[in-house]
Amino acid sequence: MELYTVGKIVNTHGIRGEVKVVATTDFVDQRFADGATLYLVKKDQAPVELTVEHARMHKGLVLVKFKQFNNINEVQHFRDAELKVADQDQAELEEGQYYYHQIIGLTAETVDGRVLGKIKEILAPGANDVWVVDRKQKTDLLLPVIDDVVKEVDLAGGKVIVELLEGLE
């Protein structure tokens, strides 16, 4: 079973077993819905299946309470663990939309065929995502994900075609 990250636990909240989660999904309401199944993944440990009892937004974070845990002592060791969802639980996306894991690792090329590097990370600072391209012997290139820049995404070919606007490089 393939698992995909939807959030990271950064701390506990209160004494009743809630955790603070930085969400890395555009589907917060769906991923953290009451009764949703998530997998807790800590480094070098097998995933643990958890069921969301309830979740709510609080100061830009998602506060999540799992059915399996009822006090702070049971969830303290979850700090820095990732919350993941199974591949079969992923929502269908509209045409032209992609999951982060589909984009990370693709090669970025210009419209004239010049290889820029590999996409290593996706930032979500505001209105649109920003792809971080790892370039050899250069600083990372930040590409805004807008129609003027991203011309084509070729998942089968493992690349994205971009047009570098003035000031991007």
From Swiss-Prot:
Gene3D superfamilies per the UniProt record, alphabetical: PRC-barrel domain, RimM
GO biological process: ribosomal small subunit biogenesis; rRNA processing
GO cellular component terms, A-Z: cytoplasm; ribosome
Domain PRC barrel: 94-168
MF-aspect GO terms: ribosome binding
Location(s), subcellular: Cytoplasm
InterPro entries, per database record: PRC_barrel-like_sf (IPR011033), PRC_RimM (IPR056792), RimM (IPR011961), RimM_N (IPR002676), RimM_N_sf (IPR036976), Transl_B-barrel_sf (IPR009000)
Alphabetized UniProt keyword annotations: Chaperone, Cytoplasm, Ribosome biogenesis, rRNA processing
Summary of subunit composition and partner proteins: Binds ribosomal protein uS19.
Family, similarity comment: Belongs to the RimM family.
Free-text note regarding domains: The PRC barrel domain binds ribosomal protein uS19.
Role of this protein: An accessory protein needed during the final step in the assembly of 30S ribosomal subunit, possibly for assembly of the head region. Essential for efficient processing of 16S rRNA. May be needed both before and after RbfA during the maturation of 16S rRNA. It has affinity for free ribosomal 30S subunits but not for 70S ribosomes.
Official protein name in the record: Ribosome maturation factor RimM
Source species: Limosilactobacillus fermentum (strain NBRC 3956 / LMG 18251) (Lactobacillus fermentum)
Lineage, top ranks: Bacteria, Bacillati, Bacillota, Bacilli, Lactobacillales
